[in-house]
Amino acid sequence: MATALQKPGMVPPPPGEESQTVILPPGWHSYLSPQGRRYYVNTTTNETTWERPSSSPGISASPGPHRSSLPTTVNGYHASGTPAHPPETAHMSLRKSTGDSQNLGSSSPGRKQSKENTITINCVTFPHPDTMPEQQLLKPTEWSYCDYFWADKKDPQGNGTVAGFELLLQKQLKGKQMQKEMSEFIRERIKIEEEYAKNLAKLSQNSLAAQEEGSLGEAWAQVKKSLADEAEVHLKFSAKLHSEVEKPLMNFRENFKKDMKKCDHHIADLRKQLGESRYASVEKARKALTERQKDLEMKTQQLEIKLSNKTEEDIKKARRKSTQAGDDLMRCVDLYNQAQSKWFEEMVTTTLELERLEVERVEMIRQHLCQYTQLRHETDMFNQSTVEPVDQLLRKVDPAKDRELWVREHKTGNIRPVDMEI
């Protein structure tokens, strides 16, 4: 992806200097943990221990050794200093601190640090708020979807949770519904216009006051004609509303719900794989490693009581099993991190696409509502033009002229009566 996807990376501890006074057995090297405590790693067998190994194979330099065959990672790096994962996908073990951390910590230098640095919520890794620095937003100052919907939210309708991505999908579908309802609203507006035009046309044919005469009669006739003209204007307005506003609103993204459903399934499948498959495998492997380490520790303690070839053989066998359990855990964690990285990248890509779609939807509706107001202004202008002839004729109404015309047509005589003579 072009966008730099900043995920919390881990910094390796500086390796400790090997002892200047004591020569370690072949393959063993010493390092310092992040807390400053020295531990030892066999680079051949990936064996890790807090106690300085002796030159005798299988026996530590001091009683009560607590060794771990887990190829330990400290802050996302192997003890040898090489990254446990590529820097862009490095993550810590996904667990909250538990009461058993003391046992595991004594066997694995970096395990306790891992628990303090991260926290697991619904199978997703997050930096621990008490120990990790604040992350830089992917798109600062933009309030982008890709920055604010990583966690789950309590479902107000029930006792469960709703994924952040699900909230974004709900907004998209709600936007589609709002768009549909706006289209229905315009449809109702069109019906009103059509009914209004029909009534205007019908009224224009009414014969009331049809016998009005003179200039006033002409003005009255124009009033009735203007109703027919206005009816035509409103019919054209309703037709344009249908073709230029209602229809585009209704047909915009006809397959949107189907597309959103596919999108939902894609992200949900990735999240399901992360939780039900990868995280479950990590927890299973972690439990198995704990059991193997306990078994190894128990056999090591037995060695303190009774030294025998059989006990040493049991320790070697337990160490091999512990090593295998450690390898299995690292493999499961690596697969988990890969799955989480895939989910992370798809979340960023998809949320940015949803963001783009929302901007596009809002802009589309805005443009068509602007078209509505433009058509409305045009309708007002046309309506004004229908009454202009009426205004002109009304200005020409002349009661005196009308009287003259009427008298000329209907006069009965201009000889006035006179007094009767005797």
From Swiss-Prot:
Record PTM Phosphoserine, positions in chain: 62, 108
GO molecular function, one term: actin filament binding
CDD domains linked: F-BAR_GAS7
Low complexity bias spans: 53-65
Phosphoprotein as UniProt keyword: yes
GO CC field: actin filament; clathrin-coated pit; clathrin-coated vesicle; cytoplasm; ruffle
Coiled-coil intervals: 254-329
Keyword Transcription: no
Pfam families: FCH, WW, WW_FCH_linker
Domain WW: 22-55
Major place of residence: cytoplasm
Region (Disordered): 1-117
Domain F-BAR: start-end pairs: 141-402
Compositionally biased spans, kind Polar residues: 41-52, 95-117
Keywords: Coiled coil, Cytoplasm, Developmental protein, Differentiation, Neurogenesis, Phosphoprotein
Listed GO biological process terms: actin filament bundle assembly; actin filament polymerization; clathrin coat assembly; clathrin-dependent endocytosis; neuron differentiation; neuron projection morphogenesis; regulation of cell shape
Compartment annotation: Cytoplasm
UniProt xrefs under InterPro entries: AH/BAR_dom_sf, F_BAR, FCH_dom, GAS7_F-BAR, WW_dom, WW_dom_sf
Function: May play a role in promoting maturation and morphological differentiation of cerebellar neurons.
UniProt-recorded name of the protein: Growth arrest-specific protein 7
Gene name for this UniProt entry: Gas7
